[in-house]
Amino acid sequence: MNILITSPFTHISKNIHSHRAAQAAIYADQLSNVGHNVHLDISGDIAPDPNTFDEVYVYHGNDWAGSLNLFGGMKNYGGIDNLIRYSKIKSKVYSLWIDHPKYSEMLKSRMNGDIHDDWNKVDWNNLNLIENQSTIIREIEDTDKIVVGDSHAISMYRPGWFVNSVPFKTLHGALKEKLSSFIEPNHRIAEFYFGNIDVRHHLLRMKNPEKSTRNLVNAYYNQLLELDLDEVSVYELLPIENECRQIPKSGHYKNKPFHGSWNERNNIRLIFKNEMEKLCANSKIKFISWVDYLINDKGELSFYHMEKPRSVHLSRNSYPHWQGRKWSGLSETSATLDKFFK
């Protein structure tokens, strides 16, 4: 079956260093793995007519928050041609991860102001049909393997694994909801990757940060131990990048890109690592230590391995298991750490 993955507004970047594009590449890889012929719309390689495909999968980004922010407004927004094209789709549409947002309702209320004439080329009635008749899809491959974590968790994807990535979810918040709530009965092998946000923003706000970190790790471990699964693993957290790194406002908490100095946060990170490693030493829980290749000669998370030009995430080019280079139009390499993990 011929499949198109597209985005209604901003084009999916072909840049392998883009975190937003990484999730789209993962979806493309999963659909390819189950036997489909997949075209991923990326900047510079946009399919002219979506209706030549059997099915269309729509990617809304990996941080959809429920509202549209159009750069340039209704007068100068640069992605209108993409929406015009999208609004004319007649093929079966699947909405990736979330219910299809009601874009037509969000935009129609803005049509009375000072707008560009091209907005009148949008097929509003058909766009409304797409929104109402699309089918949500979350798990593309039928698999018993899952990675669970915050937005960093997508970096642990590889074929045969489902990733339940929950943006902005702290370890503290995940434990309150229970780790078991993030997995389904068909999942028998699970990896967990929470805690980076807690180190960046929260643990150094505690009265006794070191004690709070150990308590959090022990609570994490205890819930991992309670899971009725065949295999459970937990990932080491990311190193700390240099404080000069520019972080988008979406990564701020209380108007700050982080709380605590580099040394303080690195100390908390190492306490987190050492405590979890100690707990897992004689346990059925596997601790995955993996970050050494990301660290520069100053002991920092190297900017080379991070999303370009800014943000807190890894570049897909530096993911440990899989990089999906072909989805950015690049040749594949064997630069993974799979042998290291075995």
Model-derived segments and their meaning:
Residues 1-52, 59-60, 98-136, 140-147, ...:
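N-terminal pre-catalytic "stem/leader" segment of glycosyltransferase-like enzymes
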Residues 94-97, 113, 127, 231-238, ...:
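Extracellular serine-dependent O-acyl
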Residues 95-108, 193-198, 225-265, 292-297:
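Active-site segments of SGNH/GDSL-like serine hydrolases
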Residues 121-137, 268-269, 277-278, 286, ...:
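Histidine-centered active-site loop/cap adjacent to the catalytic His
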Residues 64, 139-219:
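Conserved SGNH/GDSL esterase-like catalytic core that processes O-acyl groups on lipids
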Residues 21-27, 68-85, 115-122, 130, ...:
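Well-ordered, non-membrane alpha-helical segments in soluble/globular domains
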Residues 10-13, 61-70, 101-102, 152-155, ...:
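Short acidic, S/G/P-rich loop/turn micro-motifs used as interaction or catalytic elements
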Residues 244-290, 311-312, 316-322:
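Substrate-gating cap/lid alpha-helix
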